[in-house]
Amino acid sequence: KKELRKLMASLKIRHASSTLQKLQSAKILAALEAHPAFRAATTVLLYHSLKDEVDTHAFIRKWSNEKRILLPVVVGDELELRLYTGPEDMATGTYGIEEPVGETFTDYADIDFIAVPGVAFDRKGNRLGRGKGYYDRLLPRIPAAYKAGICFPFQIVEEVPAEAFDICMDIIITSNEDELSHPHHPLPPCDLSLIHISEPTR
């Protein structure tokens, strides 16, 4: 896991804040919002992206007018969930992430859909996080929600080391451009206009 995180970190440095990143983010989020599970969802847990992640900032603002949008907040070793009520109600928290300042949301059974960030994913739906275990502790509290892993194409690898207790994603959503190919990338070069949505194989 350590070596895979190191590899992804080097690729993310090349990719962060690039024109390609913006293009891929737009395509990935277009695929996300077109997914039936997202369309049907009333309460959605998103994430306020860091500069090396799929950019969700405008997406959050857009959908907060139509759905109840939750965002995670780092509190010690846990992620608390809070309702997003607008950019004016955000403050910079741990790791420089913008976080809502409102009340904690604990009605986990009401959450229909989760967009999950990660360092890497594989075709089985396994996810590699940043190593702090925040989502590993959060996701078991929300077993009924549809879980979509969100990532750039270079973050899809042949295999993510997984433990028996790890929770798999229901789907991995990425754009399928292979501009940043590397030895672990399982996808062939594809047309830029296409969107790749791969259901994990169990």
Task: Please provide the spans of the model-predicted regions.
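Positively charged, low-complexity intrinsically disordered regions
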Residues: K6, A40, P183-P186, I195
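Ser/Thr-centric signal marking residues that sit
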Residues: T56, T174, T201
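Flexible, gly/pro- and Lys/Arg-enriched active-site loops
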Residues: R68-L180, P186-P189
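Conserved small/polar residues in nucleotide/adenosyl-binding loops
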Residues: I195-T201
